[in-house]
Regions:
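Helix C-cap/helix->beta junction micro-motif
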Residues: 73-77
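Hydrophobic faces of well-ordered beta-strands that scaffold small-molecule active sites
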Residues: 8-14, 39-43, 81-85
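Aromatic-lined carbohydrate-binding/catalytic grooves of carbohydrate-active enzymes
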Residues: 29-68, 89-92, 99-102
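N-terminal carbohydrate-binding accessory modules
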Residues: 1-9, 19-24
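Mature, folded catalytic cores of secreted/periplasmic enzymes
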Residues: 1, 71-72
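Active-site-adjacent "subsite" loops/lids of carbohydrate-active enzymes
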Residues: 88-133
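The substrate-binding groove and active-site-proximal loops of carbohydrate-active enzymes
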Residues: 10-21, 52-64, 117-133
Length: 133
């Protein structure tokens, strides 16, 4: 599916991390977003997606099957589902502790000198620097 160029981009962005929210999100798509002519849904997963290859690097409970259900609901209504997964250099919440990847591999941290409970302005987000390799 492709967003039609003759229609403006009307998108909804949300962050999901819990399997129990999937049915409510599908209800939102079908009962509210579709009738309001939304044509894109950006689903930010961050550590909420349970990776099949490395499930230990996830905090959430969203599964592949959950994403398939969301995508099917979107497509039934002409909405383009757009997944958003953070890259390796963004592996923490704003002013929060590092996500599981950095907990298991602190050698990747560019900001390893900071304590887990550091807050703004001492810490914005944990980051990884390719030069740490």
């Amino acid at each position: 599916m492709e967003i039609k160029k003759d229609k403006p981009f009307v998108g909804f962005h949300t962050r999901l991390s819990d399997h129990t929210a999937v049915d409510k999100f599908i209800e939102l798509i079908e009962e509210h977003l579709a009738p309001m002519d939304f044509n894109a849904v950006i689903v930010e997963l961050n550590p909420g997606y349970t990776y099949r290859c490395f499930p230990e690097y996830s905090n959430g409970t969203i599964t592949y099957e959950d994403l398939q259900k969301i995508a099917a609901a979107c497509r039934r209504h002409g909405i383009e589902p757009i997944p958003l997964i953070q890259c390796l250099s963004h592996q923490s919440d704003f002013s929060g502790g590092p996500w599981p990847l950095y907990k298991d591999h602190p050698e990747f941290l560019e900001t390893e000198r900071l304590p887990d409970d550091a807050e703004w302005p001492d810490l914005y987000v944990y980051s990884w620097c390719a030069s740490n390799d």
